[in-house]
Amino acid sequence: LSAIQPLPLMPDCGGLIRTIALALPAAFFAENRATDTVSPLIPIGNLLSALPADITAFIVTDRASLGSARDWLGSLPASCGTELIPLAGNDGISHPWIQDMFHVRAVDAATEFVLVAEKAIGVSLAEYLGAATTHSDVALAGGNQLVGPDFRLVGHSSLQDDRGIGRNAAIPSQRWRKIQALDGRNIFSFGYRPEYLGKVPVSSDFSTTETCEAEMAGEKMHQCGFHVDQFVSVTGLRSGGRPLLLVADPVAHGGCNTRAATELKRKLDASALWLARQGFAIERNPIPLSPAIDTNKCLPRLYNNVLLENVIRSGQKRPFVWVPHFGDTESLEEFDAMNREIWDRIGFQTIGVAGWSHLSSRNGALRCATKIINRGPDTRL
């Protein structure tokens, strides 16, 4: 008997986005005190206001916040559809990173949520939308997986068994096998080997890099950062026959220590090299390591944390990508512009979404705060 193929995971590229979900903690609706430097509702409101009218956003909030959330939504110049969903039970919402909480598998009208964490949110949404739920038997945060048209890119830390990858690298780890079972697409890993550090050609031209069979990433692999979606974007495009990824290229900014930026750059250069060896085409995009506006900690601005479509909307000339922007609050306009220019150059209509400085101290941005529930078909020929 052949195993029944699971429904495919919702990709990070392809058809037009139809519905997305967000989760807003009660703390976001607390009265802003004059001393508060951050207002997390600003970037969320800007995102909702930047979505086309035919997208519906389902917003989960706890019951006590429903009135405030309704007032706030009413104040936005948003043309997209919005529906508020009260959280089931008495649980609260501890953070807005809905991307991490569950995986969406869907084909046509059949939708299934694979619950990972903060399960009340996935359950409330599924009940409201009539989706099925199942529990994941492996802890894989949505932020540590990018889903391409025919591949998945998973952060190495999620593929490693707790005891490390087995001595015999030819035997996939148990976690690798469980993650593979989530979906029919092949898994590639985001990580680097210590011996790759400092090995990258100065031009960062990976097009000539020898590919290897995606060998089981050996036990000496490390992952840069917490989640792959902090530093890598899937584009849904191919370049020279290889799937094209955007990989962040960090620089120090605003008085941040150049050493921290150089260290992050070494790890991301080495990670880009490993991606190229697995058969990806790589384009680099500049990101600043800059003091967060509330904590002053030097942190990367997550320009790779995007939402995109590859199908062109009616009346448009190019497909849309929504890119987090920071120049409205910090002196980062040039980074906003450089990142827009890169997406424009590879064929997108870039929609900059301002305000993400308000969430940068929490290491998240636009993709982290959203979950795509439904997309139209990828009608590209």
Task: Describe the predicted segments one by one.
Residues 1-381:
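Histidine/cysteine-enriched polar flanking segments
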